[in-house]
């Protein structure tokens, strides 16, 4: 498999053709079914289906899919920026039982020359008055693309929804390790963003997989649901494999938290992201 190529090295004539190739190869949005009118042809609003693989064993919506649906980028999009996420925060208000599709209502708080601040409401697409979660985040721009952008023809993959469908961590080949941690394979074209770094999608999924597994080891089937999810993207994941490192913090007041770091084992164990999950 060819190694991902950093789009910033492309010359003007080939920039957008490389972007289209990267966008249509990236697995995150195609598999989860998330579409965006700025980036995808023929799309009117940001939506994503909610399937069985996006819920826990009790049918409650998970944090990673919602964070991917919102994909906070500080109000930046690839048409005018080369966005790189810095933080993502999510508060879940509703388990989304019975919801088949969510809609994201984005709001740019402030967009500067190189940094942006954004927030979103994630609602039931059939009943927008039903708020599922609140999302917010920040991002920086790694540069400015050349003119000539056009939305990409990138329809979602056809994924049949069923109770026995593969879990998201299985689709992204995130595997358990001895000691309770998890490993995401080396960077590939299916997991790389246009700047040839590990995309936010696999990071959210790997981090929440590790957090949820830590909770189940502690509480079994009685593990409470996730309420708050926060991720800091602290460095670009360039090599891999990527390995989690987690710790559970049991508060005396009844709350439980799990902190998870994702390390690039092929790049001197560099921490590339850090998550906090509150249950």
Regions found by a protein language model. Give the residues of each.
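Terminal targeting signals and extreme-terminal segments of soluble enzymes
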Residues: 1-279
């Amino acid at each position: 498999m060819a190694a991902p190529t950093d789009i910033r090295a492309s010359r003007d004539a080939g920039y957008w053709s490389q972007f289209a190739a990267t966008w249509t190869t990236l697995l995150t949005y195609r598999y989860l079914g998330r579409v965006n009118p700025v980036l995808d042809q023929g799309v009117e609003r940001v939506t994503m289906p909610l399937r069985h693989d996006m819920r826990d064993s009790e049918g409650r919506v998970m944090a990673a899919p919602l964070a991917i649906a919102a994909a906070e980028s500080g109000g930046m999009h690839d048409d005018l920026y080369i966005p790189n996420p810095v933080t993502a925060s999510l508060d879940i208000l509703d388990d989304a039982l019975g919801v088949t599709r969510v809609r994201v209502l984005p709001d740019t708080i402030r967009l500067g020359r190189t940094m942006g601040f954004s927030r979103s409401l994630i609602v039931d697409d059939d009943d927008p008055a039903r708020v599922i979660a609140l999302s917010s985040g920040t991002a920086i721009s790694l540069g400015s693309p050349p003119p000539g952008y056009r939305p990409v023809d990138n329809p979602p993959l056809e994924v049949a929804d069923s109770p026995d469908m593969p879990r998201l961590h299985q689709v992204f080949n995130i595997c358990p390790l001895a000691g309770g941690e998890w490993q995401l394979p080396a960077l590939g074209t299916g997991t790389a963003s246009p700047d040839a770094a590990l995309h936010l999608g696999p990071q959210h999924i790997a981090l929440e997989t590790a957090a949820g597994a830590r909770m189940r080891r502690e509480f079994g089937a009685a593990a409470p649901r996730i309420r708050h999810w926060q991720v800091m993207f602290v460095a670009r994941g360039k090599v891999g494999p990527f390995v989690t490192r987690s710790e559970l913090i049991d508060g005396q007041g009844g709350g439980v938290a799990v902190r998870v770091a994702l390390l690039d084992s092929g790049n001197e164990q560099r921490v590339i992201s850090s998550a906090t999950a509150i249950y």
